[in-house]
């Protein structure tokens, strides 16, 4: 019973960290990475679909994307979606191919991105702590129903605390790594 609660908590904590990594991948550093454009949705005949489902996205060099729509009609729609995506990108259309240069990050924009990254990391830490709280309340419930002893509950709570500390340290490491990549000139 205790192991099941601990495994469930650890699994949920893993998902929180994976979600944080996903959120960080969508925040651009100074290099072109296709995940930056994956969050853009395009109006495809009345329904919103991810850009990757209507065009081929590739990285031409460290500062340029190349987008090749699969249909000629989609060029203008994709261009509009990229410009309104609030990523500060301006596509240059040449026939059916779009090249999207990444503008250099200003110091002000870097500061804004660091704040966003810090907020994401803080939300992940809160999620980890909430998972710990849920597990501890499950242990207390088992103690109340006399299914485990006080010592067993205390050991389980200490074990969950160690797991929580490990995940919090991992989140802090990911935050520092992302912050350094954003502040790198």
UniProtKB/Swiss-Prot annotation:
Pfam families: RRF (PF01765). One of its GO terms (molecular function) is ribosomal large subunit binding. GO terms for cellular component: cytosol. It is found in: Cytoplasm. The gene is frr. Responsible for the release of ribosomes from messenger RNA at the termination of protein biosynthesis. May increase the efficiency of translation by recycling ribosomes from one round of translation to another. This is Ribosome-recycling factor. InterPro entries: Ribosome_recyc_fac, Ribosome_recyc_fac_dom, RRF_sf. CDD domains: RRF. Belongs to the RRF family. The keyword Protein biosynthesis applies. GO terms for biological process: cytoplasmic translational termination. Keywords: Cytoplasm, Protein biosynthesis.
């Amino acid at each position: 019973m205790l192991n099941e609660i601990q495994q469930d908590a650890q699994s949920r904590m893993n998902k929180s960290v994976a979600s944080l990594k996903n959120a960080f991948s969508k925040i651009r550093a100074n290099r072109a990475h296709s995940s930056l454009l994956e969050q853009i949705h395009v109006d495809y005949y009345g329904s919103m679909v991810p850009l990757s489902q209507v065009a081929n996205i590739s990285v031409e060099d460290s500062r340029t994307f190349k987008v090749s729509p699969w249909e000629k009609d989609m060029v203008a729609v994709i261009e509009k979606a990229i410009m309104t995506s609030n990523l500060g990108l301006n596509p240059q259309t040449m026939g059916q191919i779009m090249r999207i240069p990444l503008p250099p990050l200003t110091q002000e924009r870097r500061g804004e991105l660091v704040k966003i990254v810090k907020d994401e990391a803080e939300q992940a830490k809160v999620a980890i702590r909430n998972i710990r709280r849920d597990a501890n309340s499950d242990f207390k419930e088992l103690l109340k129903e006399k299914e485990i002893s006080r010592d067993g509950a205390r050991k389980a709570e200490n074990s969950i605390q160690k797991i929580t500390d490990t995940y919090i340290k991992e989140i802090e490491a990911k935050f520092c790594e992302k912050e350094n990549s954003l502040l790198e000139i």
